Amino acid sequence: DWDDLRLGLTRDRDAWVADLKATQLGGTLRLPDSPRVQPIAARLTRVDLKALSGDAASTRPPEAEVPDLADEARTDPREVPALDLDVEQVQWGQADLGRLRLVTRARPDGLDLAELSLQGPLGGANGSGSWTQSADGSGAFGAPVTRLAVEGKTADLGELLRRLDFASAVEHAPAEATMSADWPGGPGDFALARLDGRVGFEVGAGGLLEVEPGVGRML
């Protein structure tokens, strides 16, 4: 749900243009008449992911209880509009995560993730990928599959975790993370239990804040 939403609509030559103002976000949205040809263009000044997520994380089933895709509605990526998204400031509550660029392009079997970039005061991430209908040996389209390759860096892992509301005993430690993986279904079907690929994580030299003795022995 969006709080205090104000919406204004105007008609352009070949698109509707929406002016959005809410507690969680603000900006403009251009909805073309042919979104597979012209992408939906979103130019947002800010998006608060914490406010948008609400209680979704607390109600999501644990990994062991992730339902089979056969029991879920499957979206055909060949029917999903292309998107050109620019967010000046992505927030998690009061934390500034940086500027987000996300661009998808239509292809015959689905969508390409042509650009994914988040650059902020504590680091950034870049990625690419696709969401397509897989083809069998006869050339017929089968189930959808999502592929994603992402690289991320931060100059201070502990501070980043704390800004995201995670407890962290690490300070002044740089970190790098990489992922190259695919999973059945769409981007929203991501789950560790479905993942096929590689995930890497490296933490550089840093310091530990005061921790409990048991935690210190473990480290």
Report each predicted region and the residues it spans.
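N-terminal leader/targeting segments and the immediate start of mature chains
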Residues: 64-78
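N-terminal mature ectodomain segment of secretory-pathway/periplasmic proteins
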Residues: 9-18
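Small-residue helix/turn framework positions
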Residues: 1, 6-8, 21-26, 33-62, ...
